Amino acid sequence: MNQSLLAPFGTAIERVEAGLNALRQGLGVLVVDDEDRENEGDLIFAAESLTNAQMAMLIRECSGIVCLCLPDEKVKALALPPMVENNSSQYGTAFTVSIEAKVGVTTGVSAADRVTTIKTAIADHAKPSDLARPGHVYPLRAQPGGVLTRRGHTEGTIDLMQLAGLKPAGVLCEVTNPDGTMARLPEIIAFGALHNMPVLTIEDIVVYRKSLLANVG
């Protein structure tokens, strides 16, 4: 990762702190993974405070494949099976079957409908019967252990929500350029500056979590 580009956002610890503060205020953050991995940046919002306007931004500015990151226990509680029996994707991204709220949506594809689906899924007492399958929201199952187990955006999202003291559920979508190509770090930093969003990396979250563990030790 080109640290010189990230320098204006502070140290790894400061970047994570800025991201946590933004999430607590109901704002978005941009998280970039390793250059030798997917090398992409995701726009992430806390699921519990997600607004229709934020969902519209995810649809408009990103790839359109809006995903709901959930911890393993929530995926089990909702009885969401894997999208495929044998996951052969390059990075083992743990998609479950797609979902739709059974109540309160029309076609399910509008920003408002997708927000309704997400709020239905993350409700404390949500039941499998509250959701139709398939739908227009794509849940992702986070590995237990977070980024210390798997350095993916899914795990990074859940880690950030937990570190911020929020419900462990986040919404993400990959940032794209206007021509449809994937945004890389320079474009993601420009996007963050335009929309006043903090930028941090998966590596930053790893450093932050390890520092917390060291302090506990």
From Swiss-Prot:
Indicate yes or no for the key word Magnesium: yes
Which parts of the chain span the membrane according to its record? none
Q: Would you indicate the residue range of the signal peptide?
A: none
For biological process, the GO terms are: riboflavin biosynthetic process
The residues that the entry says bind Mg(2+) 1 are 38
Q: Which residues are tagged with the site Essential for catalytic activity? A: 136, 174
Name its co-factor(s). Answer: Mg(2+); Mn(2+)
Task: Tell me the route in metabolism or biology where this protein functions.
Answer: Cofactor biosynthesis; riboflavin biosynthesis; 2-hydroxy-3-oxobutyl phosphate from D-ribulose 5-phosphate: step 1/1
Record: residues binding Mg(2+) 2: 38, 153
CC cofactor note:
Binds 2 divalent metal cations per subunit. Magnesium or manganese.
Please verify whether the record's keywords include Cytoplasm. Answer: no
GO cellular-component term (any)? cytosol
Q: Catalysed reaction per UniProt? A: D-ribulose 5-phosphate = (2S)-2-hydroxy-3-oxobutyl phosphate + formate + H(+)
**InterPro entries in the record:** DHBP_synth_RibB-like_a/b_dom, DHBP_synthase_RibB
Which Gene3D superfamilies does this UniProt record tie to the protein? Answer: DHBP synthase (3.90.870.10)
For the protein in the UniProt heading, the enzyme class is lyase
Query: In which residues is D-ribulose 5-phosphate bound?
Result: 37-38, 42, 150-154, 174
**MF terms in GO:** 3,4-dihydroxy-2-butanone-4-phosphate synthase activity; magnesium ion binding; manganese ion binding
Q: Which domain of life is it from?
A: Bacteria
Tell me which UniProt keywords the record has, alphabetically: Lyase, Magnesium, Manganese, Metal-binding, Riboflavin biosynthesis
Q: What does this protein do?
A: Catalyzes the conversion of D-ribulose 5-phosphate to formate and 3,4-dihydroxy-2-butanone 4-phosphate.
Q: What NCBIfam families does its record include? A: ribB
| Similarity field | Belongs to the DHBP synthase family.
Quaternary state and interactors: Homodimer.
Question: This protein is called what?
Answer: 3,4-dihydroxy-2-butanone 4-phosphate synthase
Recorded source organism is Shewanella oneidensis (strain ATCC 700550 / JCM 31522 / CIP 106686 / LMG 19005 / NCIMB 14063 / MR-1)
